[in-house]
Regions:
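Peri-transmembrane interface segments
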Residues: 30-35, 257-309, 318-322, 328
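Hydrophobic, regular-secondary-structure patches
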Residues: 46-134, 141-144, 155-158, 163
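Basic-flanked hydrophobic alpha-helices used for secretion and membrane insertion
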Residues: 154-157, 168-275
């Protein structure tokens, strides 16, 4: 007991002495030197925390948006040698039985060419104003529950179930938002809400009104022409209900890995690929994230070394220029 009291008294005394010496040093110190040291330490701290956070956060933000709006926690897609998910209705029924299932959306996909001046006569050798685009077929109600895509419509309005003659178009397909003119890369000019465009898939073409323009920062929407799923099936000559992707959202009661294992055990792996969001992220995105992490650590390390040297020089110069020294 006596030893404990002695330790506590010694600790209290040390704190009091340290506090007294600190106040005394601050009173006698050069205010500019102290300010410089505090500033360097603050900037060093910000460099360690903020720079790494910004570099990694840029990619993390893209991944989070991709996961939230495009692929969910689990994504089911066609095998690489197939064009669609086989037995899609059966797969959807299995998806709804996942413990922790919250929501899903079924999307039909394809590649299309969109033209805006198809009614005009062009001179020999000229190209029509057109662009290649991904074709995305959705159920408007189902997709809205999943991704809330209507909030990304920056002009015009969202699709409803009766809009068989209307489409949404991603901003990256429009010259107004992507003013790039390069060989092999075309965007649509003079296209706005209410314009008529022609969408062509192979030998099948149809005219549509542009009902809205999408800006989501997710390529799934920004580089796509979005139409009703029935229209995409018609354009791609698909006579069944086999879809391109099924994105699934889960609640917190189950992990994506557990949900993936459940789907594979239920036989979904026979019809399509089953991936977690982490598996589905493009490799280049993972490589960029890792590179930015290394770059952030290197910058922070260099900043720490420079700050340490700077503070040492400031303190050393301040010490040797003092008039009075204690114990010297």
């Amino acid at each position: 007991m006596a030893d404990r009291l002695t330790v506590e008294n010694s600790l209290t005394q040390n704190i009091k002495v340290g506090w007294f010496l600190a106040k005394r040093e601050l009173k006698r110190a050069n205010i500019w030197t102290t300010t410089l040291i505090v500033l360097v330490m603050t900037l060093t701290f910000l460099n360690l925390i903020v720079v790494s956070g910004i570099l990694v956060g840029l990619i993390q933000g893209s991944e989070d948006a991709q996961k939230k709006y495009a692929i969910g926690d689990i994504v089911i897609s066609s095998f690489l040698n197939r064009s669609a998910i086989e037995q899609t209705p059966r797969v959807v029924d299995i998806v709804k039985t996942i413990p922790g299932y919250r929501n899903h959306t079924v999307r039909y996909s394809g590649s299309a060419r969109v033209e805006s001046n198809y009614r005009e006569t062009i001179k020999p050798g000229e190209k029509r104003d057109g662009a290649g685009a991904s074709l995305l077929g959705i159920d408007p109600i189902e997709e809205e529950r999943f991704s809330g895509v209507s909030k990304f419509v920056i002009r015009g309005s969202y699709l409803d179930t009766n809009d068989g003659d209307s489409i949404l178009i991603g901003k990256n397909l429009l010259y107004e938002f992507t003013p790039i003119e390069a060989p092999g890369f075309q965007t649509l000019k003079n296209v706005e809400v209410g314009s008529r465009v022609k969408v062509t898939v192979g030998d099948v073409s149809k005219e549509y009104f542009v009902k809205g323009i999408l800006s989501s920062k997710v390529d799934e929407f920004d580089t796509s022409v979005v139409a009703l799923e029935s229209e995409v099936r018609r354009l791609t000559n698909r006579t069944n209900l086999d879809a391109g992707t099924i994105a699934i959202q889960l609640d917190s009661s189950i992990t994506p890995v557990e949900a993936k294992e459940f789907l594979l055990a239920s036989g979904v792996g026979e019809y399509a690929r089953v991936q977690t969001a982490e598996d589905a992220f493009p490799k280049f995105l993972k490589d960029i994230k890792a590179t930015f992490g290394i770059l952030g650590s290197a910058i922070s390390g260099i900043g720490l070394v420079v700050a340490s040297i700077t503070i040492f020089i400031v303190i050393f110069v301040n010490a040797i220029t003092r008039i009075r020294y204690i114990g010297i």
